[in-house]
UniProtKB/Swiss-Prot annotation:
Name of this protein: Aldehyde oxidoreductase iron-sulfur-binding subunit PaoA
Compartments (UniProt record): Periplasm
Top-level taxonomy: Bacteria, Pseudomonadati, Pseudomonadota, Gammaproteobacteria, Enterobacterales
Post-translational modification: Exported by the Tat system. The position of the signal peptide cleavage has not been experimentally proven.
Region (Disordered): 1-21
Gene assigned in the entry: paoA
Source organism of the structure: Escherichia coli (strain K12)
Gene deletion effect: Mutation results in complete impairment of cell growth in the presence of cinnamaldehyde.
Any single GO BP term: catabolic process
């Protein structure tokens, strides 16, 4: 008996017939060959596109600096930081490389009288500048008042950060003397005073991992009185 009457929906207009999924052997060979060719060609083209270009040759530039009172004529790679120029070219290794990211202050030097993290600036940006490093502040026979104060108050332990601490301290007293306010300066009209809060705020960019901060503060306060007198 026919079931056509029981399932009239099978005769609806527009009902799709099943697709013919049969595949001849010839068609299978064609598809396999095309797939294999794609697998061979595509990785090679991707590899060729990913090969980096040759690194350009470094650009060398003449540079004149006045470092610790002495004029230096240099030829430096334009990508070289001031820190590396001081240490590698001029062998002034008193300036330390700490974090190399401008976060610790160990590389602080004075550039035209203002403190600067030498690891964050390119040497060629300071053509003709006057640079003072820890070696230029004083000598063993004639210490700068700040150097003498750090020794007197034991403002260090391992000593790695000390050159940056001292250079920054000298600049801090100069900033206060020049009337430059800080974030903790209460009266912006009057000249800032050399208070403990002012010193702590201004020295906050110089990290001492040994924790000699109390002695560093005492040294700066002592040197401030010595320099004023």
């Amino acid at each position: 008996m026919s079931n056509q009457g029981e399932y009239p929906e099978d005769n609806r207009v527009g009902k799709h017939e099943p697709h013919d999924l049969s595949l001849t052997r010839r068609d299978l060979i064609k598809v396999s060959a095309a797939t294999a060719a794609t697998a061979v060609v595509y990785p090679h083209s991707t590899l060729a596109a990913s090969v980096p270009a040759a690194t350009p040759a470094p650009e060398i530039m003449p540079l004149t600096l006045k470092v610790n009172g002495k004029t230096e004529q240099l030829e430096v790679d334009t990508r070289t930081t001031l820190l590396d120029t001081l240490r590698e070219n001029l062998h002034l290794i008193g300036t330390k490389k700490g974090c190399d990211h401008g976060q610790c202050g160990a590389c602080t030097v004075l550039v035209n009288g203002r403190r600067l993290n030498a690891c964050l600036t390119l040497a060629v940006m300071h053509q003709g500048a006057e640079i003072t490093t820890i070696e230029g502040l004083g000598s063993p026979d004639n210490l700068h008042p700040m150097q003498a104060a750090f020794i007197k108050h034991d403002g260090f332990q391992c000593g790695y950060c000390t050159s940056g601490q001292i250079c920054s301290s000298v600049a801090v007293l100069k900033e206060i003397q020049d009337g430059i306010p800080s974030h903790v300066t209460v009266d912006l009209v009057s000249a800032p005073e050399t208070t403990a809060d002012e010193i702590r705020e201004r020295m906050s960019g110089n990290i001492c991992r040994c924790g000699a901060y109390a002695n560093i503060l005492a040294a700066i306060e002592d040197a401030a009185g010595e320099i004023k007198s």
